[in-house]
Amino acid sequence: MGSFSYTKEQRLRKRPQFLALGERGKRVQNAYFIAVFAPAQGKVSRLGVTVTKKVGDAVTRNRIKRCVREYFRLNQHRLKAPVDINVIAKKACCQQESPLLAASLDHLFNRVSEGSRH
């Protein structure tokens, strides 16, 4: 079984990383999230989370970010190849419960996994 850690190397942290991913990446979406993804430059998958102020107050935005990061931490092994992913929250996700968000992320990551095969 793989590691369930979420280290700094597995995060998109700098603006140029997000911009580069936006330029070279593919997009998939569902009712609550948009994912921009591209094959990773390194050997590990990396996650970025974008939740704008349109989604809700700070408490709501932080809850959504925690939910996305936790889902990635537990399910990163399901990605077939190393992928850089930026998950963008839509306004519709602000009033949903965590299990529904996890199901939505599951659907999204399945589509990312299918689209990331080389």
From Swiss-Prot:
Q: Report the GO molecular function annotations.
A: 3'-tRNA processing endoribonuclease activity; ribonuclease P activity; tRNA binding
Q: Which SUPFAM superfamilies match?
A: Ribosomal protein S5 domain 2-like
What's this protein's function?
RNaseP catalyzes the removal of the 5'-leader sequence from pre-tRNA to produce the mature 5'-terminus. It can also cleave other RNA substrates such as 4.5S RNA. The protein component plays an auxiliary but essential role in vivo by binding to the 5'-leader sequence and broadening the substrate specificity of the ribozyme.
Into which family does the record put it? Belongs to the RnpA family.
Q: What is this protein called?
A: Ribonuclease P protein component
Biological source species? Desulfatibacillum aliphaticivorans
Record-linked Pfam families: Ribonuclease_P (PF00825)
Keywords on this record? Endonuclease, Hydrolase, Nuclease, RNA-binding, tRNA processing
Q: How does it assemble?
A: Consists of a catalytic RNA component (M1 or rnpB) and a protein subunit.
Q: Which NCBIfam families match?
A: rnpA
Gene3D superfamilies found in the cross-reference section: 3.30.230.10
Please name the top-level EC class of this enzyme. Answer: hydrolase
Reading the lineage from the top rank, the first entry is Bacteria
EC number(s) per entry: 3.1.26.5
Q: Which reaction does it catalyse?
A: Endonucleolytic cleavage of RNA, removing 5'-extranucleotides from tRNA precursor
GO terms under biological process: tRNA 5'-leader removal
- Report one GO cellular component: ribonuclease P complex
